[in-house]
């Protein structure tokens, strides 16, 4: 099995019996966290990590580009598409996506050099506002905003979760990661 994942995405493999899965592609539905390992964005699942068997892998980028939607059998376009598939399996409780695990200054630097830096700069958010957003435990941007709305600024409220919901390594080593736990 080949898993493609960003460095800030940790797939949860604990409850998966890979021998029983017959689907061509696995999509991991992951909880999304900001700033700390236990500050979760509620009511949102990230689908960054994907997997397939080695013999099905065309390229890592092909797997990364797969749409995170299961298409109906009557969708004729799925026969000719390299990104639309019907034979997906979504892995619920599929892991953790840790984004912006940085302080305010590092987040500002990231967003200024980020792909959407023009959108960030158009919102006129400064370092003090980023610090305020982090202290109030809100997401730096709204992941549900479309292009007509302002994405950056005060996003949804984050919730603090119990340590039993974070990866075992983090849970078992709180002294190492205490700075990154709220």
Residue ranges of model-derived segments:
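C-terminal accessory extensions appended to soluble enzyme cores
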Residues: 86-182
């Amino acid at each position: 099995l080949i898993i493609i994942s960003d460095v800030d995405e940790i797939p949860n493999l604990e409850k998966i019996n890979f021998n029983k899965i017959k689907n061509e592609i696995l999509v991991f539905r992951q909880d999304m966290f900001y700033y700390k390992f236990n500050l979760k964005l509620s009511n949102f699942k990230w689908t960054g990590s994907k997997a397939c068997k080695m013999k099905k892998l065309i390229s890592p980028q092909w797997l990364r580009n797969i749409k995170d939607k299961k298409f109906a059998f009557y969708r004729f376009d799925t026969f000719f598409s390299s990104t639309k598939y019907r034979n997906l399996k979504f892995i619920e409780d599929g892991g953790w996506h840790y984004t912006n695990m940085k302080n305010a200054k590092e987040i500002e630097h990231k967003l200024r050099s980020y792909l959407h830096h023009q959108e960030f700069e158009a919102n006129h958010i400064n370092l003090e506002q980023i610090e305020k957003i982090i202290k109030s435990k809100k997401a730096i941007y709204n992941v549900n905003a479309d292009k007509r709305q302002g994405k950056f600024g005060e996003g949804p409220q984050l919730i603090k979760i119990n340590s039993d919901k974070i990866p075992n390594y983090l849970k078992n080593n709180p002294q190492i990661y205490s700075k990154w736990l709220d």
